[in-house]
């Protein structure tokens, strides 16, 4: 069984900016131990003759060729807009200069 110390849990909590109680620290240590023990099962998997791969299925993206096509006229695109300005959509401000 992999032993996770109290200090390791506190360090992880600190990195995640979490404040946890001593009881939660103990519970997290036990939970992490269980997770690590479960993950160790991969060490005993027979991978002889198995090629390394990033995906379990031999699939690849099927993409269409990029082709430039004529878009819709500007007037039509802006036809149902609530507000326009200089030939563009005008939307409410969501950030002020202080946020930028």
From Swiss-Prot:
UniProt KW DNA-binding keyword: no
Highest taxon of source: Bacteria
Record's keyword annotation contains Glycoprotein: no
Pfam families, alphabetized: GatC (PF02686)
One GO biological process term: glutaminyl-tRNAGln biosynthesis via transamidation
Class of this enzyme: ligase
Gene Ontology molecular function: any one: ATP binding
Keywords tagged on the record: ATP-binding, Ligase, Nucleotide-binding, Protein biosynthesis
EC number: 6.3.5.-
Record's protein name: Aspartyl/glutamyl-tRNA(Asn/Gln) amidotransferase subunit C
Species of provenance: Staphylococcus aureus (strain Mu50 / ATCC 700699)
Classification of source organism: Bacteria, Bacillati, Bacillota, Bacilli, Bacillales
Gene: gatC
